Amino acid sequence: IHCPEDNKECGVISINDGQLIDEILDCGEIKNKSNINIKIKDSANAHVNSINIVEGELVDELIDCLSIADSSVEIKISSSVSTSANTISITEGELLDETMDVKNHIRNSKIDATITNSANAFYSATMTITGGELIDEIIDTNEITNSKIEIKLTTSGCASYIGNNAGHTFTLTNGELIDEIIDCSNNISDNNPISITVENSANVITQNSSNHVPVLNITNSQLLDELVDCPNIN
């Protein structure tokens, strides 16, 4: 979605319990040496005057399945799932949520997820996140057993000011820029090699030629929280 820069009245977008991209792969089981390769490039971006997301996302659940066993999954997201606007509001929503939603388990498998220059928010007046995130749950599952997991985030999940307004504000309440890269509700077991790399991400950036001081309001929130959320790792 693109609004021409010379048309300031163009582009007021509201996403309520919806997405731009949802469930590229929606299935039961991924098994028997399956090889899944998903690449998202220059997609699901919104360059508009104002964007309001309520209980929705730009991208949600690229993979939605019951289980993954004896298989390989590779996901690459680049220059996607970002927004630039005068005002940005996210309430109980995300730009990128549950890249992989695996209801039951991941077993004897290899998962490789790379996110580059994506899920970024560029604002020129105000940005507000309430109970939401820019990136949440790259992997959401119940159990990970005997699997190799590699996740790399580079220049992603950032909030960047790009205007010249004296009164610009960034407000983060009960939310995060990046939260729960792996959310495993039961256990991670059998010596799983898990590698998570975060580079130049989850930053609040002010680029202001007029030297206006931004107003930053961060309440009960974090920029980066819970790389792995799991009750048992053994």
What residue ranges belong to the model's regions?
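Low-complexity repeat regions of mature extracellularly deployed or surface/particle-associated proteins
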Residues: I1-N234
